[in-house]
Regions:
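N-terminal subdomain of nucleotide-sugar transferases
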Residues: 1-7, 47-49, 68, 72-74, ...
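Donor nucleotide-sugar binding/catalytic pocket of nucleotide-sugar-dependent glycosyltransferases
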Residues: 8-11, 78, 108-173
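A conserved catalytic-core segment of Leloir-type glycosyltransferases
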Residues: 1-40
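A polyampholytic, Gly/Pro-enriched intrinsically disordered region
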Residues: 27-34, 97-107, 171-178
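Acceptor-binding helix/loop patch of EC 2.4 sugar-transfer enzymes
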Residues: 14-26, 78-116, 160, 165
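Short, well-structured alpha-helical segments in soluble
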Residues: 37-49
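Short, intrinsically disordered, charge-balanced linker/junction segments flanking boundaries
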Residues: 1, 64, 168-179
Length: 179
């Protein structure tokens, strides 16, 4: 049990203009505007309150990482990050009539990956969690290296080594059916 004491909430809004522009698959733009507005407040809070760790929990969106790693004397944990996966072949029929959105999203993903590498934003993280292997490979693969530890975590909270492989699961199901 961890008693919650002295919790403070700070509300930071963004202008409605950005809310109207950044909708749907462009939502990460809204988060990036918000991150820029929050950074000065986060710096002040960390200095005044002696904060040790900032953990940015995004809506599983690698395109919307704040630059909290620039704040002095704190550890910046980011993730779980997702959004780097491509539309699976088995679901391409569902995208009929909306293919342009997937093409634009793919282009935006590549641009943000390039931007993250150039700015070094990922390397200012002290720890990164990835929500899926595709995003991990998309951001770390291709010769990119991270200067911080990272791991793959799933949205169900299980680590890959905690998952039962399919054949083991089938065996358990068969045993249960026999009883």
């Amino acid at each position: 049990s961890h008693p919650l004491e002295n919790i403070k909430f700070y509300y930071v809004d963004i202008p409605n203009f950005y809310k109207k522009i950044f909708k749907g698959f462009m939502y990460s733009g809204r988060l990036n505007v918000w991150n820029r507005r929050v950074l000065p407040l986060a710096k002040k809070i960390c200095a005044d309150q002696k904060i040790d760790v900032i953990h940015q929990i995004t809506p599983i969106e690698f395109r919307a990482i704040g630059d909290y790693g620039k704040i002095a004397n704190i550890k910046f944990v980011c993730g779980p990050l997702g959004g780097g996966e491509s539309l699976p072949n088995g679901l391409k029929d569902y995208a009929k009539g909306h293919e342009i959105i997937e093409v634009v999203r793919s282009g935006i993903n590549r641009w943000y990956r390039f931007k993250l590498r150039i700015t070094g934003k990922l390397n200012r993280c002290d720890y990164i969690m990835f929500a899926n292997k595709e995003t991990q490979e998309f951001l770390v693969g291709g010769g990119a290296e991270l200067n911080c530890p990272y791991e793959l975590v799933f949205d169900n909270g299980l680590r890959p080594d905690e998952l039962v492989n399919w054949t083991e699961k089938e065996k358990v199901n068969e045993e249960l059916q026999c009883k």
